A protein has these predicted regions:
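Start-transfer (signal-anchor) and selected internal transmembrane alpha helices
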Residues: 1-38
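Membrane-interface transmembrane helices that cradle and orient dolichyl/undecaprenyl
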Residues: 128, 163-181
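Short acidic/glycine- and proline-prone juxtamembrane loop motifs at membrane-interface regions
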Residues: 148-156
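Transmembrane-helix motifs of polytopic, lipid-linked glycan transferases
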Residues: 107-126
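Transmembrane-helix signature of polytopic, membrane-embedded enzymes
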Residues: 120-142
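Extracytoplasmic loop-helix module adjacent to an early transmembrane segment
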Residues: 39-71
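Short hydrophobic/aromatic helix or loop-helix immediately within or flanking a transmembrane segment
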Residues: 57-64, 76-101
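Membrane-interface starts of transmembrane alpha-helices
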Residues: 25, 100-108, 130-133
Length: 182
């Protein structure tokens, strides 16, 4: 009986973790810098991003839409088909059940801050480059787009690098596929 190959998501997650955990120094640097880059999101009372108050208000309306105490349904209509922030809003809305709207926002932004360097490390590893160079992605977490509050835009950066690395892995697997003549 022929065994099936592991799913692409499992291979992706295993390869991402393998790119980091092989080198203890690299793992320590990633862990320390991830803490350092996430810490500013949690120490202040307010995040210094331009559009965050409007995003928090929108997430708050979505989260308390059916709550009679707020009566948002009388004044607002939630239309999820006309926003480019859908992943951000829905994720924060789900997280808000456990941690509140503001902390859900902090969790989402922290996730971006950790995923960006990890995705760069995955991409560099897939292309056979020095994974240590991914540490240079940490200063890039704090960019103009983040401070303007374009959360959906900056959250796409990790997907870009994960996608480039995944594309390289898939191209390599096609080249080495059994029965493929080169």
């Amino acid at each position: 009986m022929e065994t099936q190959s592991p799913s692409i998501i499992r291979r992706f997650a295993t390869a991402t973790w393998a790119h980091i955990r092989v080198d203890p120094l690299l793992f320590t640097c990633f862990f320390t810098l991830s803490f350092a880059v996430v810490w500013p999101f949690w120490v202040g009372e307010f995040l210094p991003f331009l559009d965050i108050p409007q995003h928090l208000a929108t997430i708050g309306v979505m989260h308390h839409y059916d709550d009679a105490a707020f009566d948002h349904a009388a004044y607002f209509l939630v239309d999820t088909s006309s926003t480019q922030y859908l992943l951000y809003y829905l994720t924060c809305d789900l997280l808000a059940d456990w941690v509140g709207v503001e902390d859900a926002n902090r969790v989402f932004i922290s996730l971006y801050a950790v995923l960006l360097p990890l995705s760069v490390a995955y991409c560099l590893g897939a292309w056979g480059r020095l994974k240590l160079a991914a540490l240079l992605a940490y200063p890039l977490v704090f960019n103009k787009f983040l401070f303007f509050g374009f959360i959906n835009y900056v959250f796409a950066f990790p997907f870009l690098f994960f996608g480039l690395g995944l594309m390289k892995c898939m191209l390599d697997s096609l080249r080495t596929a059994p029965g493929r003549s080169t």
